Amino acid sequence: MTRPSRLRSLLHRSALLLAACASLAPAAHAAKPLLTFKVDDTVTARVERADREHITVRFLPSGKTQTLDVIAADEEGHYHLSSDDYNFDGHRDLAMHATLGMVNDSYGIYLYDPTRQQFEPLHLPASDMPHGNCDDLVNVVAKPKERTLYSSCRGGPIWYTDAYRFDASGKMYLYQSSEAIPDDLRDLLDADSGPSSMLLTYDAQGKRVSRRPDAYGGGAVTFKVRPARLPLHDAMNDAPTRRYVVAGDTVEVIDASADFQWLKVRYRNPHAGAVQGWVSAKEAMGN
C-alpha cells in the first residue's frame, strides 16, 4: 500500500471511531441516573428520566423496569427526588418534591410494595375520613421512632402540621391535626408566644379521641387574668360558683367549647392546690 493510501485508510478509520463515540455519547448521557438507592438488603432502585412527565425505575439485580408519573413538580416542570421509609415497613420508598410558593415543598410519594416488587402511589385518606389542614403532603418529615409522617404548610401567619400514621393494613390515616382558635381569643392566649391552636387526635377508624389546647411549638396554653374577678363555673352556662380567679393570676386552658365561647381553665392555688372550672371567654377577654 502506498503512503497516501495508508494515510487515507487511517483517516477513514479515525472518522469512523469519532462517529461511533459521538453516537454513544447521547445514549450514555440519557442513561445517567437521577437517583440510585437501596430499597432493602436485596433490591436497588435506579431512577432515570423517561420524558418530561415520566421517570423509569430499574430494579437491580432483576433488571425489571417500571414507568412512573411525575406527581410533584413546579410550574416549570422541575422536581427533586429523594428516598426514605415513609410508611415504616423496612423498605425505602421514592418521593418527588418541588417548591410551590416561598416555603411549601409539595410531595408526591411512591411506596415500595415488596409483594409485587414495584412502587405504588401513596394516597391521602378517603373522602369520608378526617383530613388535615394542608391540602396535600407538604414539607414531609418521617419520624420512625414515632412511626408518624408529618406534613406541614403555612397559611397566612400560621404554620399547620398534620400527622399521619398507618393502620394494620398499611393504609394511611390522619392521626393529629389542628383547629384554629379565633383571632380575638388568640390575642388573650398568645400574648407571649406564637399562635396557639386546638390539637385534634384521631384513631385509625377516623374517630376523634381527643381535643386539647396546644401552644405554639407544643405545650400548655396559659393566659393572665384581666378582670378584677373572673368567676368559675362547674359547667358551661351554669350559674357561677363562689370560686374565682383574680387579675394577674396565670391559668392554664385545658379545654374549650366548640364555639370557643367557654374555656375550661386550671389554676394552681399555692394554698388550696389546683382548682378548675369553666370561664366565659367574653369575660376573660374583658369585653
Language model features: what each stretch is:
Residues 188-231, 238, 244-247, 254-259, ...:
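SH3-family beta-barrel domains
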Residues 118-215:
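Short aromatic loop motif centered on NTY/YTY
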Residues 85-87, 114:
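Calcium-coordinating acidic loop motifs
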Residues 248, 263-268:
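SH3/SH3-like beta-barrel fold
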Residues 30-79:
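Terminal domain-start segments
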Residues 13-25:
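Bacterial N-terminal signal peptides
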Residues 87-98, 146-151:
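Acidic/hydrophobic-patterned starts of short beta strands in beta-sheet-rich repeat architectures
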Residues 103-109, 158-163:
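Structural motif
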